[in-house]
């Protein structure tokens, strides 16, 4: 059987004339040195969650620097009440899916995967085994939640070649201990503790730090105090080195009410890629988040 001849550009088709193909822009793969250069230049880092190959490819094409395979997939994909029920096998499955999506389009995004609940609490050795599972699935970095008690684990992983993103403030894996989804670090004592924990994690080698639902002033202070650790805010104001949102929240397709810190970029975009591009542009230009609307 003879293969069909590809339709050339500018040829007439039943649907109109095909436009000439535009060359894909040449982009360098995102790396830790590249993220450091961006921060030094004052350019905001953009991050979104991704859970499958197609959305990963679209987000990468829209210019997102970092993709997070978050255990939030338990809530937005599996319908679980929290992230606690997400397994390591599930995280590896979705990480591999996202990695394949990036590979198919020669994507450049930096890929981070969450270490799920129960996969690192026993100590550094357990964390290393779990991290190896996610790195072998295609992750470039792993993320774990928790304060100073995780610092020895962070150091252990970094010394063995595993880049680590830490996570302070509201830590969804321990939401039951925190009494619900509440802003963290509001009291003077809590703010001091968060600053101290952030310094510990930077000293242990964490290259990135997610700050979730933390007062904007505190998040800015922490960011200024961490020259070697890039802060990524979600509900933490505009003063962090970058921003992250759950993909479903920024597309307005979650199962409940959109959180205060999110914005529905799909409402005016008309397409998924357009919405993600609008998010990237808004973060880069300093229009999102608006501290008066999206922060505490």
From Swiss-Prot:
Coarse class of the protein's main subcellular location: cytoplasm
| GO CC terms | cytoplasm
Q: Which domain of life is it from?
A: Bacteria
What InterPro entries does this protein's entry cite?
A: Pantoate_hydroxy_MeTrfase, Pyrv/PenolPyrv_kinase-like_dom, Pyrv_kinase-like_dom_sf
Q: Enumerate the UniProt keywords alphabetically.
A: Cytoplasm, Magnesium, Metal-binding, Pantothenate biosynthesis, Transferase
Cofactor: how and how many bound: Binds 1 Mg(2+) ion per subunit.
Point to the regions of Low complexity compositional bias. Answer: 1-14
Stated name of the protein: 3-methyl-2-oxobutanoate hydroxymethyltransferase
Q: Name one GO molecular function term.
A: 3-methyl-2-oxobutanoate hydroxymethyltransferase activity
* Disordered as annotated region, ranges: 1-29
Enzyme class, spelled out: transferase
What is the active site of this protein? 212
Q: Where does 3-methyl-2-oxobutanoate bind?
A: 71-72, 114, 143
Which Pfam families does this chain map to? Answer: Pantoate_transf (PF02548)
């Amino acid at each position: 059987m003879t293969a069909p001849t590809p339709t050339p550009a500018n040829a007439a088709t039943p649907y109109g004339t095909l436009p000439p193909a535009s060359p894909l822009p040449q982009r360098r793969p995102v790396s830790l040195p590249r993220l450091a250069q961006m921060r030094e230049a004052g350019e905001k880092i953009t991050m979104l969650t991704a859970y499958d190959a197609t959305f990963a490819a679209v987000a990468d094409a829209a210019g997102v620097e970092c993709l997070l395979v978050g255990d939030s997939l338990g809530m937005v994909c599996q319908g679980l009440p929290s992230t606690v029920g997400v397994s390591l096998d599930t995280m590896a499955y979705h990480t591999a899916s996202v990695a394949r999506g990036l590979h198919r389009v020669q994507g450049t995004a930096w890929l981070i995967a969450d270490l799920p609940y129960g996969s690192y609490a026993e100590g550094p050795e357990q964390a290393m085994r779990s991290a190896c599972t996610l790195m072998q699935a295609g992750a470039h970095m792993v993320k774990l939640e928790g304060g100073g008690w995780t610092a020895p684990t962070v150091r252990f992983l970094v010394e063995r070649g595993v880049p680590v993103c830490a996570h302070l403030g509201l830590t969804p894996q321990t939401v039951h201990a925190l009494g619900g989804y509440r802003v963290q670090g509001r009291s003077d004592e809590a703010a001091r503790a968060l600053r101290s924990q952030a310094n510990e994690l930077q000293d242990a080698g964490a290259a990135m730090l997610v700050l979730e639902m933390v007062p904007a002033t505190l998040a800015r202070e922490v960011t200024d105090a961490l020259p070697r650790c890039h802060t990524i805010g979600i509900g933490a104001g505009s003063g962090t080195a970058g921003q992250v949102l759950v993909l479903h929240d920024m597309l307005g397709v979650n199962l409940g009410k959109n959180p205060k810190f999110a914005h529905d970029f799909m409402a005016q975009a008309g397409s998924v890629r357009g919405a993600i591009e609008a998010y990237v542009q808004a973060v880069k230009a300093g229009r999102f988040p608006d501290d008066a609307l999206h922060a505490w």
